[in-house]
C-alpha cells in the first residue's frame, strides 16, 4: 500500500532514478545461478556467461536513518571494497547494475555512494551506463540480487544493455 515518502509506488510503476520515482514495486520470482571455477568450467566445456571477479560485503547498521534506509558511507565503502578485491579499474566498467528500487531515498543515496567510490579512482564522469532490473520485473526481495546478476550476465553475453523503463528525467536529489 502506497504511503507518501515510504517504500511503495503510488501507481504500480517502478521509476528507477527518475524524478517522479515515489517507490518500489513488488515482484514475484526466483533466480538460480551456477557458480563454478573458471578453469573447471572451461575444462568441462560449459557455456560461461560471466565471471565473478570480486565481491564486497558490509553492514552499515548504525550509520543510517532506519532499517530500510541505506547509507552513503556504507555503500561507498562496500563498492570500493568490491573494486579493490576484483582489481578492476572503474574506468573500464561500461555498465553497472544498481540495486535501484525507485524510492526517493534509496536511489539518490546509491548514486551518491557510487560517485564517491568512483571518484577515488577517476575524475571522469558519465562513462558508465547504469540500470536496474527492478523497473522491468519489480523487487524480488531475496532473489533481487541474483536477478540483477543474471541481467548483467545476459547483457555481457549479448553486448546490448536493456533499457530501464519508466525513466524520463533524472532524479536531481
Q: Which ranges hold each PLM region?
A:
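Condensing-enzyme catalytic core of the thiolase-fold
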Residues: 1-173
Amino acid at each position: 500500500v502506497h504511503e507518501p515518502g515510504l517504500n511503495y509506488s503510488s501507481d504500480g510503476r517502478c521509476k528507477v532514478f527518475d524524478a517522479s520515482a515515489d517507490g518500489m514495486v513488488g515482484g514475484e520470482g526466483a533466480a538460480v545461478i551456477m557458480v563454478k571455477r573458471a578453469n573447471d568450467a572451461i575444462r568441462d566445456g560449459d557455456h560461461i556467461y560471466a565471471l565473478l571477479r570480486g565481491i564486497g560485503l558490509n553492514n552499515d547498521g548504525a550509520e543510517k536513518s532506519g532499517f530500510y534506509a541505506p547509507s552513503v558511507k556504507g555503500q561507498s565503502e562496500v563498492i570500493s571494497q568490491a573494486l579493490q578485491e576484483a582489481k578492476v579499474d572503474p574506468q573500464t566498467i561500461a555498465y553497472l547494475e544498481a540495486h535501484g528500487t525507485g524510492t526517493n531515498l534509496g536511489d539518490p543515496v546509491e548514486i551518491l555512494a557510487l560517485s564517491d567510490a568512483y571518484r577515488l579512482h577517476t575524475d571522469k564522469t558519465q562513462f558508465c551506463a547504469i540500470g536496474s532490473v527492478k523497473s522491468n520485473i519489480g523487487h524480488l526481495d531475496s532473489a533481487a540480487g541474483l536477478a540483477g546478476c543474471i541481467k548483467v550476465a545476459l547483457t555481457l553475453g549479448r553486448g546490448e544493455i536493456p533499457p530501464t523503463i519508466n525513466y524520463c528525467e533524472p532524479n536531481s536529489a
